């Protein structure tokens, strides 16, 4: 470390202390959205996303699926990092409940994850997404199942 993670990372990703292939973060769907992981660790993390026209629904505001996706991704990465330090294995999402609280159409949003429950079989994480003025635009909870290592 420090290792930049995600597409167009401008700051190094800090606090990653477990054996995870950082090159895999920010690939796939995260890359399509433009998610950048800023800080990650077993107790939570931060990701950012700059809103552009691709992420808007027909009425000019951010599509709710964008928020659901950031929430799912950050919760999954956070849960995986915790599990890697606490016995190993893999996590899979089993429920994503996202509330859309404020409509925006531009700017950069920041998502922050924090654990609610981390147990032997399941984890529950809360993610809050704020805009550049620190207003909450969405929040969500993701329940994840801990699976044994194969």
Describe these PLM feature segments.
Residues 11-150:
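Terminal targeting signals and extreme-terminal segments of soluble enzymes
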């Amino acid at each position: 470390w420090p290792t930049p993670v995600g597409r167009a990372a401008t700051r190094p990703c800090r606090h990653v202390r477990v054996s995870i292939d950082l090159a895999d973060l920010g690939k796939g769907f995260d890359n399509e959205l433009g998610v950048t992981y800023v800080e990650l660790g077993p107790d939570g993390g931060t990701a950012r996303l700059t809103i552009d026209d691709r992420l808007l629904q027909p009425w000019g505001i951010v599509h709710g699926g964008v928020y659901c996706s950031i929430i799912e991704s950050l919760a999954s990465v956070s849960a995986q990092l915790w599990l890697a330090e606490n016995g190993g294995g893999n996590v899979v999402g089993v429920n994503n409940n996202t509330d859309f609280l404020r409509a925006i159409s531009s700017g950069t949003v920041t998502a922050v994850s924090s654990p609610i429950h981390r147990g032997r079989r399941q984890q529950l994480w809360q993610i809050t997404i704020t805009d550049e003025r620190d207003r909450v635009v969405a929040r969500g909870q993701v329940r994840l199942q801990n699976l044994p290592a194969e």
